[in-house]
Structure formats: C-alpha cells, structure tokens
Curated annotation (Swiss-Prot):
GO biological process: translation
Family as reported in the entry's similarity comment: Belongs to the universal ribosomal protein uL10 family.
Family annotation (Gene3D superfamilies): 3.30.70.1730, 6.10.250.290
Official protein name in the record: Large ribosomal subunit protein uL10
Gene: rplJ
Amino acid sequence: MGASREKKQQIVAEFKDKLSKAQTVIFTSFSGLTVEDETVLRRKFKEANSEYKVYKNTLMTIAARELGYGDDLIKYFEGPTSVAFGYEDPVAPAKILTEFMKDHKGLELKVGIVNGKIVSPQEIEALAKLPSREELLAKALGSMKAPITNLVFVLSGTLRSLVYALNAIKEKKQAEA
C-alpha cells in the first residue's frame, strides 16, 4: 500500500508542477473519444509544445486544493476528465481543442485556467479565435518595418528626382555649348 501512496503523491506533485508552469490549462470531458482519437490529439499537442494528459479526479482535486483553487474549479472534476497544458503559447491549447471538437463530438470543454484565472468554455472558444503569439509578433514586426520601408521609397524617389533634374540641367548646358 505504501508504494501506491507514494505513486499517488508523485502524480499529485507532477500535476501541481504542470498546473503552476502552464500559461493555459484546459479541462475537458473525453467520454466519446477512441484511443486513436486520443493519440492523434496528444500528437497535435506535442507538435505545439503543449501537453494533453488524463489524471484521476481525486488526485487533481488534492493538487488543486494545495495550490489554493476552490470549488469553483474542483466542481468540474467529475466524469472522465483530461487536461491540456499550454506552456509557451497560451492560445495553442484552445485552438487545438476547438478545432478537434469540430470533427469529434465526444470531446467537450469543461473549464480552463488562463494565467491563474478560471475561465468558462465560452471564454476558451473566444481565446481560440485570437491569433497565436507568433502571428502577433509577425504583425508587430511588419508594422514596425512598414514605416522604414516607406521612408526608403520616399528617399529613393527624391534622390531619383534629383538625379533626373541634374541630368536635365547637364543636357541643357551641353545643348547650349
């Protein structure tokens, strides 16, 4: 019995660690998914530097209480519950799950935690519609690059006009001579 208790304590510690490190945590009900569906979903999470796991509800309850979460989160730990962790991009888990739910009706959002705040399934779906971190960085870089590019075009246009004007003056002087 001691080894089983130690194993459970390790699982609680692992879950607490993941819950603390993740920017986004989404709890789902997966009762209608096949093992093959779960494998595909895990692979998608791995590709996005995220994680998808199943924990026992009782162990998640212990870990959540130890981290200071109350019944507003723990009440969702009923029935088959899986957990998606997003470490780098807070939008990635929401995007993966909502996209996967379109083709797999057995997967349902229960509740989420985004940067320590408990969020509803509707808020998770809204989060999924936001651009990813990489997309936002690309847009920011593009908007910073645009004024510089425009300045280059304006300056090169001005220089080009100056060259044409000087060339015209040169040709006029040569024609007069």
